[in-house]
Amino acid sequence: MEHNRQQLRLMQLSSSSLPVGSFTWSQGLEWAVEAGWITTDAEFKRWQIQQMEQSFFCVDLPLFIRLYRACEQNDAVSARRWTAYLLACRETRELREEERNRGAAFTRLIKSWEPDCPQEWLPLFSQSQLCGMAWLGVRWEISAHELALSLGYSWIESAVMAGVKLVPFGQQAAQRLIIELSDHFAAGLEHAWRRGDDELGAATPLSAIASARHETQYSRLFRS
């Protein structure tokens, strides 16, 4: 019974219907398409694999693991440090605003689901959804590994759905891309899990340029 409950909670957290605005940001993809860098589903796949290998595996995933451990130990000082580190790794104002907006939306959910959440943690959640997700995973007794898979799938699905609108490509291609990118994520998960503190950080200059240029793009579907 308890395991079933945990699995259902995990499905809820990975659901595309979770009201945190994940489908309102393109993370630079919209400008990359406008610039002609991405014109096919194959080019989209290469772009997303680069983002996964050079950013998600180097920043998001290893920092999530550190945040989860901090929440396990009720260590708000460490959680504050890693949340600040995460924001520092977001290379543009648009990416930082996305992080904070999603964090604020997720904080509202946590306050509704867990009204007895300690007040000192709420400002951290509002800075990053990753911190709130880690705390909620500990509270709901969902393992870090399962939550990491959920985060990866949500990230992949959001990116592919943005690609459907922007590149564009059809739903059949989208489902194939989700499978292929999920396989790539599963293959790289363990290495990302073992990254040391001195291996944290991303170098994705094209993504940063695309995100920065998106602000002045003449016509946009996604937020900036």
From Swiss-Prot:
Domain of life where this protein originates: Bacteria
Keyword Cytoplasm: yes
Pfam family, one: UreF
GO CC terms: cytoplasm
Subcellular location: Cytoplasm
GO molecular function: nickel cation binding
Keywords per UniProt: Chaperone, Cytoplasm, Nickel insertion
Oligomer and partners: UreD, UreF and UreG form a complex that acts as a GTP-hydrolysis-dependent molecular chaperone, activating the urease apoprotein by helping to assemble the nickel containing metallocenter of UreC. The UreE protein probably delivers the nickel.
HAMAP family: UreF
Function description: Required for maturation of urease via the functional incorporation of the urease nickel metallocenter.
PANTHER family: UREASE ACCESSORY PROTEIN F
UniProt-recorded name of the protein: Urease accessory protein UreF
Organism, scientific name: Enterobacter sp. (strain 638)
Gene: ureF
